[in-house]
C-alpha cells in the first residue's frame, strides 16, 4: 500500500494552561487543506509529541480524523517513551482511520542498530498495521540505511520511510534499492524535497508546510508536472524560509510563523528571553514582507 503526496506535519495548538486547543486545531487543519496539501501528519516532531500524554495525543488523533474529508489522508506519528505507549497510540490511530503510522526510533537512550531493528519489527508485527520508519536522528536514535533496507525487505508491515535525516546520499540509495518493491519513500527534510521527488520518491511530510502550505503544495505540483525552472524557483524560496526558521528550536519557528499569519498556537514551551523576543519580532517582520513577494 503506497502512500503518495505532500503532507503537512501539523503543530499541536495549546491554550494558556497547556491543554490541547481544539478550535485552533480545527482552524489550522482547515487552513492547510485549503492550501491544497494531500493530507496531514500529526504526532511528529512538528507536533512536539514528547510534550503530551497518551490520552492527549489520542484526543488529537480523533480530532484530526474528524476534520479530514474522504479525499485527504491522515498519517499519525506514534513515537513515545515506551513500547507500551507506542502500541497504544498505534491501535488508537488505526481505529480512527489513519492510513499509515510513522514509527520513530526510541529517544533519549542510545541503542545499537540491532536493537532498533528488533524494536521496529516488534511494533509493526504486533500492530499488524502499515508502518513508515521515521528517521529523526536529531532527536531520536538514527537508523542506518542498512537497517532501513533490511526492515523494508524483511518486515511485512514496514512499508516505507519518512527520511528526516537530511542525508542527500539516501535519496538516490533508497530510490535505487526499491527495484520494483512497493515501498513508500517520503522526504522529511524540506531542503531535499525537490531532489527526492525528482529521484522518484513518492512525496514528502513537511514541517514548513504547516506554516506555508501554499509554497510546498506548489513545489510538489511543479515537480509532478516536470517544470524544472519553476521547481528550482520554488525550492529556492523554500530554502530562504528554512534558513530563517533553523535558528529557532524545533518547531518554534513554525509556530511563530503561524502566529504571524493569524493562527497563534499558544505559548511556547519555555520562558522567552528578551533576546528571543527580539528575534521573534524580527523574524515575523521579515516573514510578512517575504510572503508578499513569494509568488506560487
Which residue ranges define each predicted feature?
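Secondary-structure boundary/capping signal
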Residues: 72-73, 131, 159, 182, ...
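A general structural signal for well-ordered alpha-helical segments in protein cores
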Residues: 25, 57, 61, 86, ...
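C-terminal alpha-helical cap/extension of soluble enzyme domains
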Residues: 2, 7-11, 31, 35-37, ...
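Catalytic alpha/beta core domains of metabolic enzymes, predominantly
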Residues: 125, 138-246
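Short, flexible micro-motifs
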Residues: 8, 21, 42, 46-50, ...
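Alpha-helical structural signal in soluble globular domains
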Residues: 35, 59, 63-68, 92, ...
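Short, amphipathic alpha-helical "lid/cap" segments that border enzyme active or binding sites
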Residues: 22-29, 117, 145, 277-287
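Active-site beta->alpha loop and helix N-cap motifs at the rims of alpha/beta catalytic domains
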Residues: 2-140
Amino acid at each position: 500500500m503506497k502512500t503518495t503526496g505532500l503532507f503537512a506535519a501539523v503543530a499541536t495548538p495549546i491554550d494558556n494552561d497547556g491543554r490541547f486547543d481544539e478550535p485552533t486545531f480545527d482552524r489550522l487543519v482547515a487552513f492547510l487543506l485549503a492550501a491544497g496539501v494531500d493530507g496531514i501528519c500529526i504526532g511528529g516532531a512538528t507536533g512536539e509529541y514528547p510534550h503530551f500524554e497518551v490520552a492527549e495525543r489520542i484526543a488529537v488523533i480523533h480530532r484530526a480524523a474528524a476534520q479530514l474529508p474522504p479525499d485527504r489522508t491522515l498519517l499519525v506519528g506514534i513515537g513515545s517513551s515506551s513500547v507500551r505507549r507506542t502500541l497504544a497510540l498505534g491501535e488508537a490511530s488505526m481505529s480512527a482511520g489513519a492510513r499509515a503510522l510513522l514509527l520513530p526510533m526510541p529517544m533519549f537512550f542510545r541503542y545499537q542498530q540491532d536493537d532498533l531493528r528488533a524494536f521496529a519489527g516488534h511494533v509493526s508485527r504486533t500492530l499488524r498495521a502499515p508502518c513508515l520508519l521515521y528517521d529523526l536522528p536529531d532527536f531520536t536514535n538514527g537508523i542506518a540505511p542498512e537497517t532501513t533496507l533490511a526492515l523494508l525487505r524483511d518486515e511485512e508491515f514496514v512499508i516505507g520511510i519518512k527520511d528526516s535525516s537530511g542525508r542527500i546520499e539516501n535519496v538516490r540509495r533508497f530510490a535505487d534499492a526499491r527495484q520494483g518493491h512497493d515501498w513508500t519513500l517520503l522526504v522529511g527534510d524540506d531542503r531535499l524535497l525537490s531532489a527526492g521527488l525528482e529521484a522518484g520518491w513518492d512525496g514528502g511530510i513537511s514541517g514548513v508546510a504547516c506554516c506555508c502550505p501554499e509554497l510546498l503544495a506548489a513545489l510538489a505540483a511543479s515537480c509532478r508536472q516536470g517544470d524544472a525552472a519553476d521547481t528550482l524557483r520554488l525550492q529556492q524560496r523554500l530554502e530562504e524560509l528554512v534558513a530563517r526558521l533553523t535558528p529557532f528550536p524545533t518547531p518554534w519557528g513554525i509556530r511563530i510563523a503561524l502566529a504571524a499569519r493569524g493562527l497563534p498556537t499558544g505559548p511556547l514551551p519555555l520562558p522567552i528571553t528578551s533576546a528571543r523576543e527580539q528575534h521573534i519580532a524580527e523574524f515575523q517582520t521579515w516573514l510578512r514582507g517575504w510572503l508578499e513577494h513569494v509568488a506560487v
